[in-house]
Amino acid sequence: MQGEDLSRYDSVVELRVDSHYTDGVVSLGTIVEMFGIAGTKLAYMIDGDGGLMRAFESVEFLAPVYHGDFVRATARLLAVGRTSRKRSYELHVTARTRGVGPLLTSGEVLDPPILAARAVGITVTPLDRQRLTPPALRRAS
């Protein structure tokens, strides 16, 4: 993939998460789901189709995410093959309510945000579903 600047292909989603665990820690499945949501949005931007997750090369959980946290998941395009797309994912905690202030409604924006998880994964978008793929990305594969 020479010549094409992939840095412009990224997707960001943000939301407030909750937990059903007694210690208030958010399920790791919720974090992976956030990667999937950001990744699907990225796939729509690139191909006009959500594609299919093939595998994660790596997934790292680096810091806990708690009930009430605001998180930002980012998916970035790293490489494009004929039908495969390699992506990186990051999840940052951008605001926290746990242990902040005297009230249940207390919270604060984190500066800098906390990197809570990261991953690298491969997705597949069959050729017949690549309806919006930019010509430069098609030529590169």
Question: What is each PLM-predicted segment?
Answer:
Residues 13-15, 59, 89:
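Preference for bulky hydrophobic residues occupying beta-strand positions
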Residues 66-67, 76-141:
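HotDog/MaoC-like acyl-thioester-processing domains
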Residues 1-52, 110-141:
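Hot-dog-fold acyl-thioester-processing enzymes
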